[in-house]
Amino acid sequence: IGFIGTGSRGQYHLNNLKTIPYADVVALCDNYPPHLKEASALYPKAKTYDDYRKLLDDRDIQAVMIATPLYEHAHITIDALHAGKHVFCEKSMAMTCADCLDMYNVFKESGKVMFIGQQRLYDPKYIKAMEMIHAGTFGEINGIHTFWNRNGDWRRSVPSPSLERLINWRLYKEFSKGLMTELACHQLQIGSWALQKLPEKVMGHGAVSYTHLTLPTS
């Protein structure tokens, strides 16, 4: 396995791969040296790269795992499939529907496996819930209300202002699609899974609510 993207999510996967005896991580890639150094400490025998294309040139690598920022998912996945690698790519699949379609079309022609990391698909509690829904335990499903309780900040400290966008990419429109791709993708996927259908129409609205504030009445 070659691993591309060794930040927080990448290192989470790398630690989990240590529990799988037949998962042999032989190469690591990241364009941020501190992350690459941390990952290399987990797999000291693995080759290291700062350019994913050099990793893909290694013919001994059968599969790659991609845990880069969202804006890099599409082109790295497509390049990996063209290089003859199986691909596990973190969610969300890509920045745009057009990018997702491009990835899918290349995958269909490649003869390789492409898996997007929507982890609820193999979470036992979600699987059990879907079995009950599809068996009719709750009757006909006419609507779904999902929510996410999270009190965390996406902003991370940076050692230099020049690294702001590299490290805090989730906060910038050119690199991320915000809450919809970072969190709501899970909820949308659950809705499609539960109903066994894809949406015909989509509408959205949003707001920033400050429920913890006490406002004067006069």
Question: Locations of the language-model features?
Answer:
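NAD(P)-dependent dehydrogenases' Rossmann-like dinucleotide-binding region
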Residues: 5, 9, 120, 137-161, ...
